[in-house]
Amino acid sequence: MTTKRIAVTPGEPAGIGPDLVVQLAQQAWPAELVVCADPELLASRAKRLGLHVTFRPYLPDQAPRPQEAGTLTIAPFKLVTNTVCGQLDEQNSAYVVETLRYAGEKNMSGEFDAVVTGPVHKGIINQAGISFSGHTEFFAHQANCPDVVMMLATQGLQVALVTTHIPLAYVAKAITRQRLHHIIKILHADLISKFAITSPKIYVCGLNPHAGEDGHLGREEIDVIIPALNELRAEFQMNIVGPLPADTLFQPKYLQDADVVLAMYHDQGLPVLKSQGFGKSVNITLGLPYIRTSVDHGTALDLAGTGKADIGSFVCALNKAIELSSKN
């Protein structure tokens, strides 16, 4: 099997991202991990944590080779100003965004096989005057993808979302037949092309309690969700089950048969997933022309430089990126 080349962006330099990357370097990996970062930042963080890491330059003209324990392959970027653990500095926001831009470009060109992203701080990037609503939106805009899908995965459960980071008061209006068509088509296509699932089984949550109770607890199921699902079944022969009440759907008898659960909004699906696999789940962006996975946590500024950050989610994100890239 050909060795894959995975881009890794540590994210916010004052957060735990650099800590996690130098901790991950303590073990061997079956892919080449190209870390897009300032090597001085990583060296400083490794020293602070008492870890030994040897840096080697990224050589794009050479064939990728598995990452040896104790090493990191570096695509170098320079911080604008020195970073203090736990202290945000807007001067370094452009650095963070530039690492993402590079990783996205090289994935689109085929130089990299996937990208794994560490946590960023949206607030400090916007404070620097750079419009930034998140990794997902950044990569989607860069790749000219009008629609992408956020899916989180842990052992035995994958949950995709129809709506993501919007206020709960706006969710019902955001769920339209057109949006459901776009989301489910992307979900179905990527489960086939990236996950190698021949006929994906998609289980869909209702929006309202009891999936609307025949319209007595809301009409979104009757007016929007059921018609959209029926159209997709009829036109594309998709294997879709639902809409089912969310409190019913998240039971073993349904989950054991589902390749993915489609939740209508963020806090409908993700609490169940994080309860089942907190610290061991991974965020996957579907609909991009390449594989992108991410940790499921934030920058944890208070833990930066302490050695107390849990690498579990980053390990899962890397393993998932390697697994998916090996199928493509």
From Swiss-Prot:
Task: Tell me the compartments it is located in.
Answer: Cytoplasm
The protein's required cofactor(s) are namely: Zn(2+); Mg(2+); Co(2+)
Gene Ontology BP terms: pyridoxal phosphate biosynthetic process; pyridoxine biosynthetic process
Alphabetically, the GO molecular function entries are: 4-hydroxythreonine-4-phosphate dehydrogenase activity; cobalt ion binding; magnesium ion binding; NAD binding; zinc ion binding
Q: Which domain of life is it from?
A: Bacteria
Listed under catalytic activity are: 4-(phosphooxy)-L-threonine + NAD(+) = 3-amino-2-oxopropyl phosphate + CO2 + NADH
Show the InterPro entries listed in the entry: PdxA (IPR037510), PdxA_fam (IPR005255)
Record key words, sorted: Cobalt, Cytoplasm, Magnesium, Metal-binding, NAD, NADP, Oxidoreductase, Pyridoxine biosynthesis, Zinc
Which Enzyme Commission number(s) are listed?
A: 1.1.1.262
Q: Name one Pfam family in it.
A: PdxA
The cofactor binding remark recorded in the entry reads: Binds 1 divalent metal cation per subunit. Can use ions such as Zn(2+), Mg(2+) or Co(2+).
How is this protein organized at the quaternary level? Homodimer.
NCBIfam families (alphabetical): pdxA (TIGR00557)
The protein, known as: 4-hydroxythreonine-4-phosphate dehydrogenase
Q: Which gene encodes it?
A: pdxA
